[in-house]
Amino acid sequence: MASTLPTTWPHESVKFEDVSLTFTEEEWAQLDFQQKCLYREIMMENYSNMISVEHHFSKPNVISQLEKAEDCWPMQREIPQDTLPECSWPSPDPGMNSFPSKSPLMKIEVVEVLTLNKDVAGPRNALIQSLYPEDLNPGNLKPAQQPSKRLTDTEASRQKFRHFQYEESAGPQKAMSQLRKLCHQWLQPNTRSKKQILELLVLEQFLNALPEKFRVWVESQHPEDCKAVVALLENMTSVSKDDASLACSSEATDQLKEKRKGVATLPVTFAAEVPAEEPVTFQDVAVDFNEEEWRLLGPTQKTEYHDVMLETLGNLVSVGWEPTLGNRELTPDSPIPVVKPIHDPNTNDLSRNGTQSTVFESILEDGVKEMHSIESNQVGNLQEKGHPQKKFSESSKSQDQTSRHKSQGSLNEVLPRKYVKVKQKGTGKRKGRTNTISMTRGLRIRKQQKDSVEWQGRSGSTPVTHGSSIKKQQQGSEQGKPGTSRDPITLTVPAKVYQKATGSEESIFMDSSDAMVPDVPPKIHQKGPEWHKVGESNNSMLQGSSVQNHQMESGAGRASDNSLLTHALPVKSHQKGYKEGNVQGNRNSWKHIKPHQKGSKGERVEELSTSEKHVPYVKNHLKTSERGKDREINASIKCDPYIKTYYRGSDVGRLRRANNCRKAFSLHAQQISFIKIHKGSQVCRCSECGKLFRNARYFSVHKKIHTGERPYMCMACGKAFVQSSSLTQHLRIHSGERPFECSECGRTFNDRSAISQHLRTHTGAKPYHCERCGKAFRQSSHLTRHERTHTGERPYVCIKCGKAFTQSSHLIGHQKTHGIKFKKQPKL
């Protein structure tokens, strides 16, 4: 036998002659049948491998000869000559055929041809099976052999083979046999030829390369071969082209009809069609509903629509977009049409589930109208120091009520729910999510040291309007001259907050020029109290803001001169013992303040001034553990060391401040979280590796890694685990329980994370992307392993020779060379 093997391997590409073997005629005659078959299989496999690596060359002569001789070789396997009449063979010896033609043994020999040699005698099977029609009865076929289930079984076998996972408990030998069995179930080499198997592999790769929208549809049709896939794709492409042309023709026809009717049609433009050189307007990104569609929406959908549209408005305002109405920019002097908002009688406050049902276009118009009509609706102007208080006239009060009614329900939609909390009372339960309002993202609550601010409310014989309004208070004289300081904005937020029967309105003052101002603790200015008298009143006022507003309406009293925050508390005239800055009373919370007594005269109101940041709606600091006892709240700030809530001169104004870093908070949740960090109970640092944990439970689990503690042990195999969940997952291996099943292919898993990773093979999702090269991965561990190729990191080091590896499996294989047993090394 002469073999042409190269002695040296050049740098040129490998040729077929380099991997082929040739025989002379004498050597070929000495080979038996099995050796010839083995030679043919090896040569054909080498030829297929050369083609698969894109080596383009003409078919060698030896391959052509082997393919021609394929049909004649089965005769040497004792197949009768009449099964392959096209091959010319010498007639067999008559003595060898000692059985009659109708003998059962002859039928057995034919059955062997059908079952064992289908890959060779496939084209002749139809002719042979026609000789035995009784064996082809559909009732004799097994259910697995039915044609309707053949494609489904093939696809299921392919999925099982592709997604096979090695289980350590099964062992390598058993796992290999299972994988080989799955491969046989899918490819079926006993019943398919090599060409058919190759067709299956090409079909699978082609389907994986298709786009997602094509692949899902093609797989649903269950194509048998590549030709069927190509036909399906061509039909789908032609149908899509026909639909596109039909849509274009119908659109052109509609436009022609409209032109004939004389109707001026405008092209419909979407946000994606806005030219790049034109600025994006709110109408390009807004979604509108009519009244009928709005009624069909549920409370949750309305709330989501409310939040999305307000966030969009805030984003546009933050990048410099100015609100407009009717494509016309609004100015304070421009006339604005009155748009009556749609009210829901069941929702009167700023509850989460009670969003006013208005289309956003009217919401925007009402909000912008209030923003630009502030100067025309001035009421309750704050006076400069030294000027007497201006009395309200009947016209100003009626104008105030009109503006409140017009803005009712509109500002609730315009103002995003941020920065100001509104705590509601009446159900006795705490709301799941507090309602907050703000002008936009760039409008923060802030008090300036030199701006005069006071709390305003409404308490009178007329009912309180549960709406919202914005009023601009100007500094200056009575003649309307502008003042020197900036103009604060009074934001009135009425709601049923403090009592069920008595409603009240409160005002929060915000500086419109302070956009996106960080929350900085203001300086503290202490000032002595001032006393004012309140005239006769038949009103029951719950809050100091109601008392102050009552003073302004009746003309009694005067506003504070330089107070940044004015709060009036009703005090009985016969009570004594009040000191400067102190408030004594038997109460459990700031809400339980005795109302203003009817018909009382000469009662004094204590006015306490401070410049601390005011948070009007907060949780009660002191619980009812000392109910019935008198408490004295000093003017200086007090702090409970555990709840961290500070008091000022009254129960209303509270400031939250961390005691060891002097950082102020306006939100209770932020303050509690911050204090936990200071106390050390929220952040835990591992002394071994330096890792930080915000959860003590995770930290306790992490410590067991260093100590080697494994308290949860399997009673079946003795394996121990750090967490109980790991033991539960391990026990499913012994019990065989696989509770998680894939709805696509029917495969089951014993772990939730395993099925979530498996589902990505169906959806094609690759959520983990490399920031350097953009390559995507289905699992985070694959991304971590890939990133080491960029960084050069090798965290797994051999303790014997110091060689480093990127994967733990490589280290385990390397340790075998040193005679070390399987033992993973920790990451450095």
Swiss-Prot record:
GO MF annotations for this entry? neurotrophin p75 receptor binding; sequence-specific DNA binding; zinc ion binding
The residues covered by the SCAN box domain are 158-240
Pfam families linked: KRAB, SCAN, zf-C2H2
Note down the stretches annotated as region Disordered.
328-355, 377-490, 575-611
Q: Which GO terms describe its cellular component?
A: cytoplasm; cytosol; nucleus
Recite the UniProt keywords alphabetically: Apoptosis, Cytoplasm, DNA-binding, Isopeptide bond, Metal-binding, Nucleus, Repeat, Repressor, Transcription, Transcription regulation, Ubl conjugation, Zinc, Zinc-finger
Q: Which PROSITE patterns match?
A: KRAB (PS50805), SCAN_BOX (PS50804), ZINC_FINGER_C2H2_1 (PS00028), ZINC_FINGER_C2H2_2 (PS50157)
Report the InterPro entries cross-referenced here.
Answer: KRAB (IPR001909), KRAB_dom_sf (IPR036051), SCAN_dom (IPR003309), SCAN_sf (IPR038269), Znf_C2H2_sf (IPR036236), Znf_C2H2_type (IPR013087)
Q: Where is this cross-link: Glycyl lysine isopeptide (Lys-Gly) (interchain with G-Cter in ubiquitin)?
A: 15
Name of the protein described by the UniProt record: Neurotrophin receptor-interacting factor 1
Species source reads Mus musculus (Mouse)
